[in-house]
Amino acid sequence: MADIFDRLFSLQGKTALITGAAGGIGRVLAVALAEAGATVGLHDLTLAQLTESIRLVEAAGGRAVPLTANLGEVAACRQLIADAHAALGRLDILVNCAATNRRKPIDAVTAADFELISAVNLRSIYFLCQAAHPVMQAQGGGKMINISSINSFFGLGSVSVYGLTKGAVTQLTRVMAVEWAKDNIQVNAIAPGFMATPLSQPVWADPYKAEWLRSRIPQRRPGQPDELVGALLLLASTASTYMTGQTVVVDGGFLAGGSWVEDQ
């Protein structure tokens, strides 16, 4: 049994770069990549933010390569790929996990809000992948994994900019998959549901919102970041060599539908 799992899911000898590696989801995914055998480039805004992620990757027996960049700047995105390639020697896997949000109704969103969320959540992914493409092309292939959101698939108040950026990431994933399939590069996305992370903490801390969500999630609870690891390892490994342009939804059944109140 171990042989088939190793053959399909092992990342031994692979290198990966994950952005937003200090965040709630990014840190867990970074450790999972290391546990699967990859050398992991850990990105965030500052080295201080990465201290705990580095410790956890090394505790898992992995090698961590810390990298910093302000993903709000296109030049910094391109430089991050160059730095990662130089430090890692090659780039087999790119995981775009960095994200930000400001919860406001549309009427309260400022141009600065729009620019920040769009730059981090969408523009950075576009130019990180653009810069990574020739690197992966030259080495014979690779894996790009974009962290999208179930907000790609339904409307929710007060997250208009976040939702549109994640919807765009889902579509961008398809287009990149089509353009780069000839280079043996698989581009896929993961769309988490309502997860228990620092970014979503204000939602779960609100009793009304928390109860509203639980009543609509068939599994009746928030997801945990480590429940995204299975999807990550599928998309990062040889188990998904004929899978590209897809968005894997991990949402406790939220998008599948709900129950009548009396059935809950």
Predicted features and spans:
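Canonical Rossmann dinucleotide-binding motif of NAD(H)/NADP(H)-dependent dehydrogenases/reductases
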Residues: 10-41
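C-terminal substrate-recognition "lid" of short-chain dehydrogenase/reductases
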Residues: 88, 126, 141, 222-250, ...
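Substrate-binding pocket helix/loop in short-chain dehydrogenase/reductase
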Residues: 105-106, 113-115, 213
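Alpha-helical segment proximal to the catalytic Tyr-Lys
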Residues: 134, 178-182, 241
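Short C-terminal tail/terminal secondary-structure segment
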Residues: 2-7, 154, 233, 244-264
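Active-site helix of classical SDR
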Residues: 129, 165, 173
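Residue(s) in the substrate-gating loop at a strand-loop-helix junction
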Residues: 149
